[in-house]
């Protein structure tokens, strides 16, 4: 494997605002030894997020739906619809939340949808999935595959026109689904075709599946031992609870066996103080090398999903501004049809 030249000292230089917060409120990640502790800490953090969730705009409706899966289970979905935009002019994005495949997070990105839906006339479908350790590999991936195919088959019923844009987005474990599903959609020739991908802090490798020489190139795993939110040790806890099949491309999409050619344009948002930083950057490089269009932003000195866990940071405003710019960029690649 060629040397990956993507480590920058600025990435892990702690954001000044965050440094002051951590002096008063230490992250506590070093004390996490099991998934139950992680879930408890996660719930406490989300109480802060709940106070910052934007109100629902007047021109956006929200509908809760149930999506069927292969084993007969129905999983939750929430549809954000721009009611003032005619259905024929609406694009659609399917979005998968962060979780480490183990933690609840389906409402984490509601504020994002409340911004994108009215601004861009985009129907946003936020999809849940079953979690480990209660449901082990490959249940979460199967839920993602089944829900994506269901949405693809029901876009018009969901009030959107795929010719205006059909997008996949996700954060962390949800970002993993974005990569996996885009390859499946390409290889299986799923219609309508995807027009854009949005990768937020994606998990794209299983360290245990890589040889030492390759793993050594992902320096972010060494540089984030004391990071807030997630550390390499916490990533180990997630994998131990989800128990993926060794070498599965579903958890190692960076090395997807059918390669990365002919994928839609990809927008990346990665965090500098995050174990997953380097795999996100490496994946962006791999997509670009395969001839795909990409755009990458790295937020220096902040941890994984900082906009969820540290919503008081002023950098969160930039995250939303970048999200708007990034989605505008994805929309710009959609082939225009006559109005």
From Swiss-Prot:
Coiled coil: none annotated. One of its GO terms (molecular function) is hydrolase activity. Keywords: Hydrolase. InterPro entries: AB_hydrolase_3, AB_hydrolase_fold, GDXG_lipolytic_enzyme. Gene3D superfamilies: alpha/beta hydrolase. The keyword Hydrolase applies. This is AB hydrolase superfamily protein B1A11.02. It comes from Schizosaccharomyces pombe (strain 972 / ATCC 24843).
């Amino acid at each position: 494997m060629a040397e990956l030249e993507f480590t920058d000292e600025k990435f892990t230089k702690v954001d000044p605002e965050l440094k002051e917060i951590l002096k008063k409120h230490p992250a506590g990640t070093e004390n996490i030894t099991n998934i139950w502790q992680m879930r408890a800490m996660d719930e406490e953090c989300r109480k802060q997020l709940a106070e910052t969730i934007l109100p629902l705009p007047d021109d956006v409706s929200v509908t809760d739906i149930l999506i069927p899966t292969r084993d007969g289970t129905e999983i939750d979905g929430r549809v954000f619809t721009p009611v003032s935009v005619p259905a024929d002019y609406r694009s659609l994005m399917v979005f998968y939340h962060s979780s480490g495949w183990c933690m609840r997070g389906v409402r984490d990105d509601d504020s994002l949808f409340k911004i994108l839906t009215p601004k861009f006339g985009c129907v946003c479908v936020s999809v849940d999935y079953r979690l480990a350790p209660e449901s082990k590999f490959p249940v979460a991936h199967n839920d993602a595959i089944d829900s994506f195919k269901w949405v693809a088959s029901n876009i018009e019923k969901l009030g959107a026109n795929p010719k205006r844009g059909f997008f996949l987005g996700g954060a962390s474990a949800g970002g993993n689904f974005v990569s996996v599903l885009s390859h499946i959609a390409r290889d299986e020739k799923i219609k309508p075709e995807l027009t854009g991908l949005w990768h937020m802090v994606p998990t794209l490798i299983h360290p245990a599946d890589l040889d030492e020489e390759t793993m050594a190139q992902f320096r972010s795993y060494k540089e984030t031992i004391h990071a807030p939110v997630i550390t390499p040790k916490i990533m180990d806890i997630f994998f131990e609870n989800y128990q993926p099949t060794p070498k599965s491309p579903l958890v190692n999409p960076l090395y997807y066996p059918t390669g990365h050619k002919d994928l839609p344009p990809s927008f990346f948002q990665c965090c500098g103080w995050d174990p997953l930083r380097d795999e996100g950057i490496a994946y962006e490089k791999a997509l670009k090398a395969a001839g795909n269009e990409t755009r990458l932003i790295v937020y220096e000195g902040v941890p994984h999903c900082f906009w969820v866990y540290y919503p008081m940071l002023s950098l969160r405003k930039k995250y939303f501004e970048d999200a708007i710019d990034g989605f505008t960029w994805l929309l710009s690649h959609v082939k225009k049809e006559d109005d």
